[in-house]
């Protein structure tokens, strides 16, 4: 369930194994194509997309990140990570949600092994000893499967699954997302700036624009979103500083609350939860989407290594979750640590942050850890 990028990539991974899949999507057919939200793709995600033949379809729509500049407002200390330093073609890549979805669907349209049903509203899910049964409000219902994959972002169907429990914790933060144009061109550099109003991330998105993600306390970001464009651009410059010059223009703001979600319990057979349906995290480290792709890859790999009759069994489901447990916990801990350290404006902590950024810039093992975490989730 779910025909977003994670669900689409999972189906293409199965098609590579000559396995059939049926994607069920609540939205209309072309809804995702106009979605301009920026996705930060890790190098590991690029390798998955290359393997599926998607990268060639996307290459002209993707902006590589060659270096990442991290600093703190009104404080010493900064860190610079460079792809060249680690013999990587890029530290990451930026693409719009809509462009990625279009490329994935273009590839799926060439496959007879993947079917997509749009505007499919699920009314009930029943788990039997040997299968999962899904009921919809359409004539194509019910549907039976040995393995039901929930990859709908956790928005629509989690309440329908018995024994599926998720723990949700609010960060009491809101994210503001838009595109901005600055005096100095991006030149494939991404910036992370820690400020008293929360972290500001600028991701190069094309030759002339940055995608901006500004996260902070709910009350601060909600007030910011109500300001006029010229006032907002001045505020952004005030907090970000002069590194890209003044900000000249921006698009319409999108805001959304930030929450951490983790699985506490799940059905023991015939249902697996992946992507944002399984876990959501703060965007400060850019790990959420890429963790979902690693979920999809790990599950498809396990299916490829398993006997057909074993897929969906209790031992199969248990093996999958155990294979993802360690990395997911480490990624959530890593992300939460960044939030706690860099979203707190206490004076003592601010000094510690400045020292940490200086230390990081001169201590290769920590930089190696960061690059591996960003690139491969390790």
Q: Where are the regions that the model predicts?
A:
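Conserved FAD-binding catalytic core of PHBH/FMO-like flavoproteins
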Residues: 49, 140-142, 147-245, 253
């Amino acid at each position: 369930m779910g025909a977003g990028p994670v669900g689409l990539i999972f189906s293409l991974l199965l098609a590579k194994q000559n396995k059939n899949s049926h994607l069920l999507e609540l939205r209309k057919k072309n809804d995702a194509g106009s979605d301009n939200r920026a996705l930060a793709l890790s190098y590991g995600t690029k390798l998955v997309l290359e393997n599926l033949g998607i990268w060639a379809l996307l290459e002209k729509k993707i902006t590589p990140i060659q270096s990442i500049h991290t600093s703190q407002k009104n404080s010493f200390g900064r860190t610079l990570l460079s792809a060249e330093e680690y013999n990587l073609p890029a530290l990451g890549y930026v693409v719009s949600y809509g462009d990625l979805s279009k490329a994935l669907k273009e590839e799926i349209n060439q496959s007879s092994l993947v079917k997509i049903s749009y505007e499919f509203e699920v009314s009930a899910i029943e788990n039997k000893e040997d299968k999962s049964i899904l009921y919809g409000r359409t004539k194509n219902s019910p549907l039976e499967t040995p393995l039901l994959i929930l990859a709908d972002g956790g928005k629509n169907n989690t309440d329908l699954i018995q024994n599926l429990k998720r723990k949700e914790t609010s960060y009491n933060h809101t994210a503001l997302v838009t595109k901005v144009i600055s005096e100095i061109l991006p030149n494939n550099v991404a910036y992370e700036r820690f400020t008293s109003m929360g972290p500001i991330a600028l991701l190069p998105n094309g030759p002339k624009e940055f995608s901006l993600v500004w996260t902070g306390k709910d009350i601060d970001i909600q007030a910011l979103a109500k300001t006029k464009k010229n006032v907002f651009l001045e505020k952004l410059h005030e907090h970000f500083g002069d590194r890209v010059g003044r900000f000249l223009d921006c698009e319409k703001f999108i805001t959304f609350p930030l929450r951490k979600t983790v699985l506490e319990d799940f059905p023991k057979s015939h249902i697996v939860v992946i992507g944002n349906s399984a876990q959501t995290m703060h965007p400060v480290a850019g790990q959420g989407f890429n963790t979902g792709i690693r979920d999809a890859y790990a599950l498809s790999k396990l299916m490829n290594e398993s006997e057909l009759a074993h897929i969906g069994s209790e031992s199969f489901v248990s093996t999958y979750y155990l294979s993802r447990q360690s990395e997911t916990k480490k990624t959530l801990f890593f992300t939460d640590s960044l939030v706690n350290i860099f979203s707190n404006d206490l004076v003592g902590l601010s000094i510690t942050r400045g020292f940490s950024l200086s230390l990081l810039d001169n201590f290769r093992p920590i930089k190696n850890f960061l690059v591996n975490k960003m690139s491969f989730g390790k």
